[in-house]
Amino acid sequence: MMKLFKKKDKNIEAEETLAKNAESEKTAADGKNAGVAQETKEDAPETIVCPKCGKTVLKSVVKQHKYVCYECNYYFRVRAKNRIRMVSDKEAFEPWFTELTTGNPLNFPEYEEKIAKTQEKTGLSEGIVIGKTKIYGEETVLGVIDSRFMMGSMGHVVGEKITSAFERATEERLPVILFCCSGGARMQEGIISLMQMAKTSAAAKRHSEAGLLYVPVLTDPTTGGVTASFAMLGDIILAEPKALIGFAGPRVIEQTIGQKLPEGFQRAEFQLEHGFVDMIVEREDLKKTLYKILRAHRPTTGYANFDPLHSDDNYEPTELMKEREAKAKPFKVWDKVSAARQIKRLASVDYMDYIFDEFMELHGDRYFRDDPAIVGGIAYLDGQPVTVIGVHKGKDLEDCAKRNYGMPSPEGYRKALRLMKQAEKFNRPIITFVNTSGAYPGMEAEENGQGEAIARNLYEMSGIKVPILCLMIGEGGSGGALALSVGNEVWMMENATYSILSPEGFASILWKDGKRAKEAAEVMKITAHDLKELDVVDDIIPEFGGADEDALSSIGNYMKGNMKKFLEKESKLTKDQLLEERYKRFRKF
């Protein structure tokens, strides 16, 4: 599978060099001071006890590890100022809304005294610090909830700061990143606290409708009214490992309905599996990950903003591949059916890994589950951000079982649609790689609305206002394949197939004899050349003797060169013309 970062960005390299130099100078100075210092009890290293493993650990070393226990990998909660320092460029943070003060809307007894004591103890005026900063040079609004302040609960001031931040970010055309760490609503402010959920959500909505990026980072714990409002409304949702994330906390569930919760319930990994989180990110990778996300969402015009360094790239096949292609015998129809089904055939992720500079996988349908049969996320095509979605059958038996042999569930189609709508919002072209025997026909899929999910994709894809390119790279099985193939252009690999259903199913339905599958394949017109004649596909991708590892570079280069030509062509069209082109493409049938 592709790695998140294939090559280091120059902004990251420069920032890390400065940080290393500063650390080296500090270490050298510490060494000189150590030579003359008298060892006293006060000089003894400060230690803390890890609440998970129970071991006594050096506080200075824990700090070096981004406040992660070096014995058991436990994530300590991080103060707002430290969190800001960990992800911001040096001296880049500019605080906003520091003048807001906490009131007592319900005249709750001793609330003002509790606030005053908490302010004195923490040095914070309220439970969130928010402002503008830079991350490797990328400007963004950054907010951090500090759990030391009344468990990071959301009262009027926290809600007001978040709402005002979204409003100002909308005015200044800035993305928003919020680190969430909260027990939920602030009980002492009652119904006024509850209203913050609606207020912050409405502000997030306006920010989104302005076409701007919002990234919440869910840390331990994120619960209650914070989870049920702004924390779960991001374009891309990140989480730290093992973070508790849920609406009703474990104690509330157990005390209210008496249900004992299983191990790992409501943790970040649980939320990823159930489709509510895009990525779980190690703390040491957070700054780089946030930068990569911000960079991918820089405002752009057109769809062919390629790096000039690649303008002279040669996408022609090697002489060896040309020779191999010339020697290859043409496949008969059934040979193509068999070839398309081979487990060793190049998969979506192989092409994605070869063609794109970087790939950042995003997960989840935001409703029920993440479907491993569909892999999707943000990639770069020679510097041009694109949304890439592929059906992945798997590379071995274990992987195939995990990915349900490339038969997507409703959750997979909904994940794909979520990513496509996200691409539309941020003006990213969409490229899909299709290789499926069909949508999963199981009972659970029917219970979760398989037909509706496919129909919804067909409906929505017809109106998405960015270019869509679809590549049929193996099996194209019925509506399950079509649900990812409503594009401005559809390309098909030389030995791929695309059909109303499998030849076996066709023979069984029409002739009541599944053994006549080979005969059925001949009459169904399922090959690339048949479908090119029928105008179902626009281009045939050569396989240079077979879609195997040896041919990957030649096939990948062919795809890449023609993808760039496609995007250059589509960049000349208005959004209305894009939609009309796609509508006419399918209207002609």
Curated annotation (Swiss-Prot):
Question: One GO molecular-function annotation for this sequence?
Answer: acetyl-CoA carboxylase activity
- Provide the reaction this enzyme catalyses: N(6)-carboxybiotinyl-L-lysyl-[protein] + acetyl-CoA = N(6)-biotinyl-L-lysyl-[protein] + malonyl-CoA
Q: Which InterPro entries match?
A: Acetyl_CoA_COase_a_su (IPR001095), Acetyl_CoA_COase_Trfase_b_su (IPR000438), ClpP/crotonase-like_dom_sf (IPR029045), COA_CT_C (IPR011763), COA_CT_N (IPR011762)
Kindly list the places in or outside the cell where this protein is found, as annotated in its UniProt entry: Cytoplasm
On the tree of life, the source organism's domain of life is Bacteria
Enzyme class per UniProt = transferase
Q: Does the keyword Nucleotide-binding apply?
A: yes
Q: Where is the CoA carboxyltransferase N-terminal domain?
A: 46-312
UniProt keywords (A-Z) are:
ATP-binding, Cytoplasm, Fatty acid biosynthesis, Fatty acid metabolism, Lipid biosynthesis, Lipid metabolism, Metal-binding, Nucleotide-binding, Transferase, Zinc, Zinc-finger
Give start-end positions of each zinc finger (C4-type). 50-72
PROSITE patterns given in the database record: COA_CT_CTER, COA_CT_NTER
Q: Where is this region: Carboxyltransferase?
A: 46-569
Q: Which GO terms describe its cellular component?
A: acetyl-CoA carboxylase complex
| Chief localisation class | cytoplasm
Annotated binding of Zn(2+), by residue: C50, C53, C69, C72
State the family named in the UniProt similarity comment for this chain: In the N-terminal section; belongs to the AccD/PCCB family.
| Functional note | Component of the acetyl coenzyme A carboxylase (ACC) complex. Biotin carboxylase (BC) catalyzes the carboxylation of biotin on its carrier protein (BCCP) and then the CO(2) group is transferred by the transcarboxylase to acetyl-CoA to form malonyl-CoA.
Question: What's the protein name?
Answer: Acetyl-coenzyme A carboxylase carboxyl transferase subunits beta/alpha
